[in-house]
Amino acid sequence: MTLTNQYGAPDAFVRAMEDDSYSKGDADFSVTGLLQPPQIARLRAEHEDKLSADVRDRVWMLLGTSVHNTLEKYGDGIVEQRLFGECEGVTISGAIDLDKDGHLTDYKVTSVYTVQKALKPDWEAQLNMYAWLLEQNGREAKSLTIVAICRDWMQSRAGKNNYPESMIVPISVPLWHSERRDRFVRQRVEVHTKEATLPCTKEERWSRGTYGVENEKGKLKTFDTLGDATAFINKQKTGRYYVRDVPGRYIRCESWCDVSQFCSQWQAEEKSNG
């Protein structure tokens, strides 16, 4: 991937982003790689030499790296340890930010909005895949925690309307049982190693307003996820409700996917929408 600097960021930013020391080690997939949509991962691999990103759009990665590099110096336990495991003949690796006697912690630089919403499924899955890796290495995970650092936190809003009291927010993550972890890892390996590439799901595309809940009178209310739509239906005391697909937006495809120009799924939709 080529790094561009269309908006004139200082050279120090460019050099910092070019100095990418990340490696998944001697593994076929990393934990974060397996959590990516398989279509995006495959298109990135196929078109790597054609991809580019601008410094402006990668500052958030620099912030995250800086926080990790600082905190790993002071962790009370095993820090940034890369573990390896095998599943279906595939080698998987993952770097755990902090392991203190089986209590795993992962740091996330994120937004207040993200913290205020329900726990992100990808975060829950990532921490449980780390627990799986720990088990593959003969150790037991006892608890999982995400420590969110809210980059846009404002003290003037602290404690109001579910606004976090601090910029630093520990989030407890449910620890799945061993069988569920095994099953999930196998499923992710399967979707990434299939000969035919699977299209991205609505959730993977960050859909907005694509799930419609309609009542018997034809009144429609839209939701971003199937879970939100189902939760709304479950709260209704009377009447019949139906979930159906409705036109909406796909934020990732529109603005955040670096392979959208190579994606037949997105290009076909763009063409059909005129």
For each feature predicted by the language model, list its residue ranges:
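Active-site-adjacent bridging/hinge elements
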Residues: 104-106, 232-233
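Metal-dependent nuclease catalytic cores that hydrolyze phosphodiester bonds in DNA/RNA
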Residues: 1-104, 111-125, 135, 148, ...
